[in-house]
């Protein structure tokens, strides 16, 4: 005999509050508003357990708690570092109101119908121009004859100077972005003043009187690298440095080559920006030394010694041949693989090895259920011990990975780089995400800019990131980008440097709306 409906309801298994999402919401509302919890619980229970009656609860509104009682804390910001004002010739505060140099002759503009397709997803083939964002400068043609240009502001050479092309998101918006790759607005600068002769400098008591002329003396740069980025005893070869660099991003100049130094790109690596604007110009320099080492954060570090030269010093601008010293034979067979770190990799004591041939060529071959001890050196020479195991079709590092992760401050988005030489020696390094600035001091950037303006030798430290953030760029790469022909109305877009096998990242889009002339934007 079937039971009455009331008995059937009584024999139903009751759900716990954690199994019933509606009960979970009622408990949360009860904690927020205790004065209304009883009414809300009664009405909700009647609605849920009654199959024959539908009760409509009286409407009421839950008001949020006062913002004064909230526990949110303000986000700490990096303190701005006070920087000494730049001289008038650098376009600092003293030169903001200075008249700009007379505009040069008209710049040959491209055809008005030439546009840039922003929907193209094919990776670009030309080299990336470094700086803050690593945007591409130049023109390219695809198979269909369309013209592609990716810029964030460009200086185009003319007969008596350099003309700057700016672009905005709409015709009503005028954005004056510095060349050099999204570096901020350009201030009108006075023509550059030549440095005083040695005799005049000695009479005035200038400390630069004892500095030999660039390229004709043995002056040693006094700019010191950051204390946190000291070169270790471990030998970091050129191919190891390139393995740690992002594809199409990392680039090392050779000794004797000509490069452009971008001050704003250098300042982009600092934890805080200088209060005073840096000069809206770049410096032509000659590379005198390149030293490779390891940073304290297990990143590949390059210390580049530069000597500024004048644009009209043709004898000193002769390009030197490439480094004659060949790479060691053991480093020529270097193999490597890169693994982007996931949330599990940085929070648990295990590192999931990717299932590809590159990882198999670096790590030793193991069988299922094997547990092999590994010893791998970082770039500073410290040895780390791991257990390399294969469980349930998954290869991983255990027993030691968490110690390495905490010691290097790994976060989601960083990349772990594993390398192996021909003699079986293994190394590992870290390639940081581009959102984490390198802890360089602002004082280093300011000192480098001052020395570049006085044409004194100086040093810069370059800690590579995932994007084209280099600020010491070969001269031919910059000159190729400056030969692009732009005209008002031409569509442009941002393109970020990408890794091999991935589509390029297309950023904001806009169009060229004006061409402004700055005859003193490039010089030394």
UniProtKB/Swiss-Prot annotation:
PROSITE patterns: B3 (PS50863). Pfam families: B3. One of its GO terms (cellular component) is nucleus. Its main location: nucleus. It comes from the Eukaryota. It comes from Oryza sativa subsp. japonica. Transmembrane segments: none annotated. InterPro entries: ARF_plant, B3_DNA-bd, DNA-bd_pseudobarrel_sf. SMART domains: B3. GO terms for biological process: regulation of DNA-templated transcription; response to hormone. The keyword Nucleus applies. Residues 336-434 bind DNA. This is B3 domain-containing protein Os07g0183700.
């Amino acid at each position: 005999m079937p039971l009455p409906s009331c008995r059937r309801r009584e024999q139903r298994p009751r759900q716990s509050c954690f199994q019933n999402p509606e009960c979970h919401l009622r408990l949360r509302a009860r904690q927020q508003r205790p004065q209304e919890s009883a009414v809300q619980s009664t009405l909700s229970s009647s609605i849920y357990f009654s199959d024959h009656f539908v009760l409509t609860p009286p409407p009421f509104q839950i008001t949020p708690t006062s913002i004064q009682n909230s526990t949110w804390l303000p986000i700490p910001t990096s303190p701005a570092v006070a920087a000494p004002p730049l001289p008038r010739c650098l376009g600092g505060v003293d030169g903001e109101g200075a008249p700009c140099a007379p505009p040069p002759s008209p710049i040959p503009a491209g055809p008005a119908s030439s546009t840039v397709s922003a929907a193209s997803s094919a990776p670009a083939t030309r080299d990336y121009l470094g700086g803050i964002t690593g945007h591409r400068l130049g023109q390219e043609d695809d198979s269909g004859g369309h013209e592609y240009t990716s810029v964030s502001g460009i200086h185009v050479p003319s007969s008596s100077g350099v003309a700057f092309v700016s672009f905005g998101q709409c015709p009503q918006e005028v954005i004056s972005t510095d060349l050099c790759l999204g570096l901020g607005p350009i201030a009108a600068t006075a023509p550059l003043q030549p440095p005083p002769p040695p005799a005049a400098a000695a009479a005035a008591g200038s400390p630069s009187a004892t500095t030999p002329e660039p390229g004709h003396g043995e002056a040693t740069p006094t700019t010191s690298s950051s204390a946190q980025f000291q070169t270790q005893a471990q030998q970091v070869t050129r191919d190891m440095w390139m393995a740690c660099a992002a594809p199409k991003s990392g680039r090392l100049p050779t000794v004797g080559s000509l490069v452009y130094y971008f001050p704003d790109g250098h300042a982009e690596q600092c934890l805080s920006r200088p209060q005073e604007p840096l000069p809206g110009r770049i410096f032509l320099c000659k590379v005198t030394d390149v030293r490779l080492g390891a940073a304290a954060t297990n990143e590949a570090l390059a210390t580049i010694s530069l000597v500024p030269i004048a644009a009209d010093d043709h004898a000193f601008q002769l390009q030197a041949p490439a480094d004659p010293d060949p790479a060691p034979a053991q480093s020529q067979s270097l193999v490597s693989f890169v693994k982007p770190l996931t949330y599990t990799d940085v929070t648990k004591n295990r590192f999931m090895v990717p299932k590809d041939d590159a990882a198999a060529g670096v790590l030793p071959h193991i069988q299922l259920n094997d547990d092999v001890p590994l010893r791998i050196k970082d770039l500073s020479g410290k040895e780390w011990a791991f257990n390399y195991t294969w469980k349930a079709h998954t290869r991983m590092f255990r027993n030691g990975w968490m110690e390495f992760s905490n010691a290097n401050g790994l976060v989601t988005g960083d990349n772990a780089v594993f390398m192996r030489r021909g003699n079986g020696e293994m190394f590992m390094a870290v390639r940081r995400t581009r959102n984490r600035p390198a802890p360089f001091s602002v004082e280093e950037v300011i000192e480098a800019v001052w020395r570049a303006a006085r044409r004194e030798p100086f040093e810069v430290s370059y800690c590579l990131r995932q994007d084209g953030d280099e600020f010491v760029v070969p001269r031919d790469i910059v000159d190729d980008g400056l030969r692009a022909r732009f005209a008002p109305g031409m569509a442009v877009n941002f393109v970020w440097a990408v890794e091999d096998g991935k589509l390029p990242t297309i950023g904001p889009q806009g169009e060229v709306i004006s061409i402004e002339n700055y005859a003193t934007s490039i010089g030394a």
